[in-house]
């Protein structure tokens, strides 16, 4: 008996289709493709084509399932380059700056993840919040506990989400119940890499929290993990807060700078992502650019914790790769739209400007390019994975009023970026399948 075909019937999604086909930092408005009264055709979870609805034939229509999102906007799924799933219970916690905030709120919250049931429950809530906000790809911090990684990878795998995470490595300057050793951190991380990395849409991220919480021996083991395992990420923090920078200088008196510590241990490169990058000097910034290391811009966190202002335009001018990030729970929203709003304001405060298209690019193709997943996601090129978000221009009264008065697609985009939040997400699709639907969520 012949095997039953697993090929799914194609699906046509009707809406205005928006995506970047280039980098607006380089090519300006030419980087954006807009198809009014358009369609997105998905076959077996991949993008087959996009185009004008009027170009479809009767046979095209009759051979496909059809989903009517007319009046809304289909855009590529958002990419979040830095956030902490164990900190969802302390998001919006009052009154401290970075180091004090970690000690008072973050570390106690992370200690709860020694309980696998708690980790599983938190992972489920976390993934649902990402999808509710239109985020389809994310680089995430877990805790020191292996089960925190297992829980998040399991949930992401179940919904077919493109996600990278890793066990936090800390062997000093942290509570005893969150401390590993250089050896155990290495062994646990390698076991998790062997178990999860490259399985489906999952990738592993080697995760030393930041230099102050790792001994030099642990940083040596971190380098071995990062450089001996093909395709893994390295994620950490650098130069977020002035007091932190001073502390690091005391802990590593031999180093030229905070970034120099990571460089010394071979922890820079095209798959290394560092949160914040606010207090870096010219030598550091040149090294970031030359090595291809990625800076994760976390505006809501930087403002909430009073850390400082990242220079996005300056980073781009230096050809430093950047990815926008929520940094939940120091960050105050899962929404990449809210994050873009704050990124715009931070850039304004620095005396620069960032265009609506540049911000949209950072959320989609730009973030994917920074994380080296632009061959898989980021826009609607044929053959890419069909991760997309349906944005509702009538989600709120003020957004609807502003969009109705827009004179260009750039104004529509900017309205979403400045006025939008999770209410704008009508639906989120992973590999073509609806993973979140606003109607079902109520």
Where are these regions (language model features)?
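His/Asp/Glu-enriched, well-ordered alpha-helical/loop segment
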Residues: 264-268, 312-400
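Metal-coordinating catalytic core of metallo-dependent amide/deamination hydrolases
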Residues: 147-277
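Divalent metal-coordination and catalytic microenvironments
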Residues: 40, 45, 71, 82, ...
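N-terminal metal-binding scaffold of metallo-dependent hydrolase/deaminase domains
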Residues: 1-61, 72
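Alpha-helical scaffold segments that flank or form the walls of functional sites
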Residues: 41, 92-161, 185-198
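Active-site gating loops and adjacent loop-to-helix segments of metal-dependent hydrolytic enzymes
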Residues: 89-119, 167, 172-182, 240-271, ...
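C-terminal cap of metal-dependent C-N hydrolases
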Residues: 26, 385-440
């Amino acid at each position: 008996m012949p095997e039953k075909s697993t090929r799914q019937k194609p699906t046509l999604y009707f809406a205005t289709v928006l995506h970047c086909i280039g980098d607006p930092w380089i090519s300006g408005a030419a980087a954006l493709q807009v198809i009014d009264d358009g369609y997105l055709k998905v076959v077996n979870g991949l993008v087959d084509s996009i185009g004008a609805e009027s170009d479809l034939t009767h046979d095209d229509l009759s051979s496909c399932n059809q989903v009517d999102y007319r009046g809304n906007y289909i855009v590529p799924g958002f990419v979040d380059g830095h956030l902490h799933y164990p900190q969802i219970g302390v998001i919006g916690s009052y009154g401290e700056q970075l180091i004090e905030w970690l000690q008072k709120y973050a570390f106690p919250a992370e200690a709860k993840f020694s309980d696998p049931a708690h980790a599983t429950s938190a992972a489920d809530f976390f993934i649902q919040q990402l999808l509710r906000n239109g985020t389809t790809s994310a680089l995430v911090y877990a805790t020191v506990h292996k089960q925190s990684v297992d829980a998040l990878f399991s949930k992401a795998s179940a919904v077919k989400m493109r996600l990278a995470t890793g066990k936090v490595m800390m062997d000093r300057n942290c509570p005893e119940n969150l401390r590993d050793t250089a050896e155990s951190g290495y062994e646990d991380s390698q076991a998790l890499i062997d178990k999860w990395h490259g399985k489906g849409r999952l990738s592993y991220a080697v995760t030393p929290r930041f230099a102050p919480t790792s001994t030099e021996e642990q940083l040596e083991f971190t380098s071995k993990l990062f450089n001996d395992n093909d395709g893994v990420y390295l994620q950490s923090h650098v130069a977020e807060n002035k007091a932190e920078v001073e502390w690091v200088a005391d802990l590593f008196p031999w180093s030229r700078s905070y970034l120099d510590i990571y460089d010394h241990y071979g922890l820079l490169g095209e798959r290394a992502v560092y949160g914040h990058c606010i207090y870096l000097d010219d030598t550091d910034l040149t090294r970031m650019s030359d090595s291809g290391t990625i800076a994760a811009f976390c505006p809501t966190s930087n403002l909430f914790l009073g850390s400082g202002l990242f220079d996005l335009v300056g980073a781009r001018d230096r050809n430093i790769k950047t990815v926008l990030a929520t940094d939940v729970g120091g960050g105050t929203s899962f929404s990449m739209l809210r994050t873009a709003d704050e990124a715009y304001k931070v850039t304004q405060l620095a005396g620069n400007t960032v265009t609506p298209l540049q911000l949209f690019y950072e959320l989609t193709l730009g973030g994917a390019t920074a994380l080296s997943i632009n061959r898989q996601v980021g826009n609607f090129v044929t053959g890419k994975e069909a991760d997309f978000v349906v944005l509702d221009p009538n989600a709120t009264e003020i957004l609807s009023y502003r969009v109705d008065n827009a004179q260009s697609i750039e104004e529509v985009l900017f309205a979403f970026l400045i006025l939008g939040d999770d209410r704008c997400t009508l639906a989120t699709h992973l590999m073509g399948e609806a993973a979140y639907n606003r109607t079902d969520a109520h």
